[in-house]
Curated annotation (Swiss-Prot):
Its cofactor is [4Fe-4S] cluster. Keywords: 4Fe-4S, Iron, Iron-sulfur, Isoprene biosynthesis, Metal-binding, Oxidoreductase. One of its GO terms (molecular function) is iron ion binding. NCBIfam families: ispG_gcpE, PRK00366.1. The gene is ispG. Pathway: Isoprenoid biosynthesis; isopentenyl diphosphate biosynthesis via DXP pathway; isopentenyl diphosphate from 1-deoxy-D-xylulose 5-phosphate: step 5/6. The keyword Amino-acid biosynthesis does not apply. This is 4-hydroxy-3-methylbut-2-en-1-yl diphosphate synthase (flavodoxin). Coiled coil: none annotated. The keyword Iron-sulfur applies. GO terms for biological process: isopentenyl diphosphate biosynthetic process, methylerythritol 4-phosphate pathway; terpenoid biosynthetic process. PANTHER family: 4-HYDROXY-3-METHYLBUT-2-EN-1-YL DIPHOSPHATE SYNTHASE, 4-HYDROXY-3-METHYLBUT-2-EN-1-YL DIPHOSPHATE SYNTHASE (FERREDOXIN), CHLOROPLASTIC.
Length: 344
């Protein structure tokens, strides 16, 4: 079992569930915009949020931001040790630094500040911060992260979270497998510079999913260029798909010429309406009744299209026939029945 560390009220590692993180895209010193974005992330299910700290104004804004949010806040500092200390003084629940960019004395000061507040430090490496380069870049990546860990250990600091990321899926997997064998600290998973939309989702799902299936990884961030809320939604879906998080899974047929309903839009609408439900339930959206009910019989709840409407089925049993405009309303009714049954 991995060592556990506490980030605000969230435990990472040990027997704690895998947590979902994201990072704001706003200028941190713009408190109003930053808080607004964090609240959107909270509503999506984000459990830890990271902000970029590029100057004193950003560091000092942390205190005001924390007063208005519910989830732990991580300060991301690249070079200036003074910004790390100032972020800690202003209430950061964790800092992310690169100890290799600091002198021994400066690192001592940062460690002393973190110890004084009882907060952890995340260290690690990505392809842009590799200390040495050989033919095995994944190993160079992992060894660079281990060097960062050793620098903190030399200062007597052990509340550490480790991260090794590449934009390459296989490098990310190999580097994290190597790290997992070398240290007992919690591991932060992600694919850096993953790209936009489908590309980022595919890369992250493969790398993160593979590692979690091997019991490697304690907290995740799905990096997607653009709105960070999407990162949280995809991260939660990865955990639900792996059985590591309770939630509603919407399955849908790939569609063919027999489809009598707009499967894609119906599935999206159901996901949006039921994403908040924290129970392990499966909802099927099937285009027709020819194969739909049979293929969706493993679902707890489902809908199959008819030429002039749809049928609602629960655990493979048809409950009623409805017109298409009432599908969502009736699904909500049967979902509430299922939730009451689960609670009993």
């Amino acid at each position: 079992m991995r060592k556990s560390v506490k980030v605000g009220k969230v435990v990472i590692g040990g027997e704690a569930p895998v947590s979902v993180q994201s990072m704001t895209t706003t200028k941190t010193a713009d408190v109003e915009k930053t808080v607004s974005q964090i609240k959107s992330l909270e509503r999506a299910g984000c459990e830890i949020v990271r902000v970029a700290v590029q100057d004193e104004e950003d560091a000092k804004a942390i205190r005001r931001i924390k007063e208005q949010i519910e989830i732990p806040l991580v300060a991301d500092i690249q070079f200036d040790y003074r910004l790390a200390i100032l972020s800690i003084e202003n209430g950061a629940d964790k800092i992310r630094i690169n100890p290799g960019n600091m002198s021994r004395d400066r690192l001592k000061d940062v460690v002393a500040a973190a110890k004084g507040k009882g907060i952890p430090i995340r260290v690690g490496a990505n392809v842009g911060s590799i200390k040495r380069r050989t033919s095995e870049r994944w190993k160079d990546l992992a060894e660079s992260a281990l060097e960062e860990v050793r620098l903190l250990e030399k200062e007597g600091f052990y509340d550490i979270i480790v991260s090794v990321k590449s934009s390459d899926v296989l490098e990310t997997i190999k580097a994290n497998e190597y790290i997992a064998e070398k240290v007992e600290y919690p591991i932060h998973l992600g694919v850096t510079e993953a790209g936009v939309s489908e590309t980022a989702i595919v890369k992250s799902s493969i790398a993160i999913g593979h590692l979690l299936l091997k019991n490697i990884g304690d907290t995740i961030r799905v990096s997607i260029s653009g709105d960070p809320v999407r990162e949280v939604i995809v991260g939660k879906k990865i955990l639900i798909a792996l059985g590591l998080r309770e939630g509603v899974e919407v399955i849908a047929c790939p569609t063919c010429g027999r489809a009598e309903i707009d499967v894609e839009n119906m599935a999206k609408m159901i996901e949006e309406n039921f994403f908040h439900v924290q129970k392990r339930l499966k909802i099927a959206v099937m285009g027709c009744v020819v194969n739909g009910i049979g293929e969706g019989k493993d679902a707890d709840l489902g809908v199959a299209g008819l030429r002039d409407g749809a049928v609602i089925f629960v655990k493979g049993e048809i409950k009623e026939r409805v017109s298409k405009e009432f599908v969502l309303e009736r699904l909500k009714y049967y979902l509430n029945e299922l939730l009451e049954e689960v609670e009993r």
